[in-house]
Amino acid sequence: MKPQKSLRARAMDILSRQEVSRIGLKRKLAPHAESEEELENVLNEFAERNWQSDLRYAEAYIRSKSRKHGSLRLKQALAQQGIDEKTSRNLLPDRSSEKQAAIAVLRKKFKHPAANLKEKQKQARFLAYRGFDADTVQTALKHAWDENWEDSC
């Protein structure tokens, strides 16, 4: 029979694999904690030693997802993980990067421009689902198949 891992060792294992927000780490450790106080002590220690950082988590999350998702979806996902809006707003990609990402996502999913209104609405819904705002969706639909537009960004 294996000996039980300490809460501190479990936290170290989790953080050695990937960046995790404080709320995410708390959720993963909670079933193994004997008390709320013990859990908070471990979380505070890891934050003080900078082993767990919400800022690093947000940077890594945005870096990995920003090519596929828009600012609205990224902001919402970070808020669910307990990252405050000010932090997430500072890390989000700028407007031109987001428009280029929307165009890339649109071109990958749909190989040709919309032939009719129904197809255009389908493409707009797809981009909106991915978290792109209305302005970005309209720009992407308008310029996705313009070869010269990317150079002007």
Curated annotation (Swiss-Prot):
Main location as per UniProt: cytoplasm
Entry keyword annotation includes Cytoplasm: yes
Source organism, top-level taxon: Bacteria
Cellular localisation: Cytoplasm
One GO biological process term: regulation of DNA repair
UniProt keywords, alphabetically: Cytoplasm
Cellular compartments per GO CC: cytoplasm
Family named by the database record: Belongs to the RecX family.
Function noted in UniProt: Modulates RecA activity.
Protein's name according to its UniProt entry: Regulatory protein RecX
